[in-house]
C-alpha cells in the first residue's frame, strides 16, 4: 500500500481554503457544513479547527478576504492601463466579468446576500460593496467631469451599475448566451443611453464611447 505524502502546514491551509471556496460557492454559507469542507479537502475536522479556531465563520471570512484582494488587484491593474476615465470604466467592467468567469465560486461568495449570514460577515460584505461602489463612483464622476457635467449623481449611477452588473454576471455565468466582450458593450451602452439624456455633455460621452465600443452595432440591434 503506497504511503500518503505528509502535507506541510501551509499546504493543508491552502487545501482547506480551496475546498471552502468550492463548497461555499456551490451551497452558500448557511447550507455549508464543516464536514463537507474537510471531506473535500481530504483532512480531518480537528485539522480545520487547528488552522481556523473560529470554524466555519472564520474560514469563510478568510476565503472572502483572499478573493476580495485578488479581485481588487485585478480591477486595479486593468483600470491602470486606461488612457481616459471612460476606458477605465470599460476595463474595470471587463476585469470584473473576467474574474467571475475564471472564479465562479469566488464570485458567488462575493455576491452572497443571504439574510442568515453572521453579522460580522454581513458587515464585511457591505464593506466589499462599498469599496467597489466608491471606486465606480470616482470613475463615473471623472467621466462626467470630462464631459463638463455635474458629478453629483455619480454615487447613484455607481450603485445602480454595481447591482446591475452583479445580476447580469450571475445570469451570464449560468447561460453564457453572449461573449464577455458583448456583455461589456451592452452594459456600457446602457450607461451611454442614460448619460445621453443629460442636458449637456451627453454627445461628448457618446463620442468617447464610440471610440472604445461598437455603438453602431448595438444601436442597430436595439432598433
Regions found by a protein language model. Name each.
Residues 1-11, 199-223:
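N-terminal intrinsically disordered/low-complexity leader segments
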Residues 12-20, 37, 59, 63-71, ...:
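Generic hydrophobic, amphipathic alpha-helix propensity
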Residues 13-14, 34, 57, 61, ...:
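Short, structured helix-loop boundary elements
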Residues 15, 23-58, 62:
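Helix-turn-helix
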Residues 72, 119-145, 155-163, 182-185, ...:
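Amphipathic alpha-helical packing segments from all-alpha helical-bundle domains
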